[in-house]
Amino acid sequence: MSNAETRLHFRIGYLGDSYHGSQIQPDVVTVQGELVRVFQTLGWISKTEEEHNLVLSSRTDAGVHVRVNGGTVRISSELWKSITPRKFIRAVDDLLPHDIAFLDVREVGFDWNPRIALHRVYRYRLEGIEFWKDPGEVLSEWLSMFEGTYNATNFARLEPGKNPIRTILSCKPWIVEGRTVGFEIVGEAFLWNQVRRTAMAIHQMALGEITPEQVKSAIDHPDISVDFGVAPPDWLILWGVEWEDSPIPDSFSECNHFSPPPLPSRAAERTMRKR
């Protein structure tokens, strides 16, 4: 059998409630861990290799949901030639848990990097947070403060050595059937907890506990430490990741049907927790 390998780019979606985040961690269930398990069960990647070759484009924390994320994996070229993409997807999907969907797969070059994307799109369902009040038209003004290129230290859990400069391409209300359910934020890349800390700042402004001037100052003066808190992960969705040669296809259609706002008892859980 030939030792030649083919590198594949795949896309997945999942509900995050049952997972301790996307990346493999010891002794807990993760999305990446489930994917590796399935590929090993199928015999498509080695069970003995210490470092698996399956990587994901964007990390997500425990409880965060994903509409479209991506990743890469290397498999035998002989295997890839012997199976159609449709059968490949079905084989993987049949062994995955019901809350992970394997969406598509294609061949890419070995220099193709899933972590270098044109942009990532996140949406946060603000109405899920306890005591949320829709502030009306002023929400657009508040969200626009987060657009542009700036040091996002005050809106992230900054990891050592991580560049805090981020570019936010757009930040706007998320409206479904005339109802403002939250906001959408688009950027090239995000820092850890950046979207959830942005969500909590918006929530605090809506409650009147902080002012837009305080938020603007936190953006303009990253050297002065400010902590507005972090919103719960339950209402965060990685809506999509787009690459230059792989836009989000039309088949992953816009979701225009949403349940009513969550009941207060559901919304209350972990709302005001800080990290």
Regions found by a protein language model. Give the residues of each.
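Structured-RNA-binding interfaces characteristic of tRNA pseudouridine synthases
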Residues: S2-R275
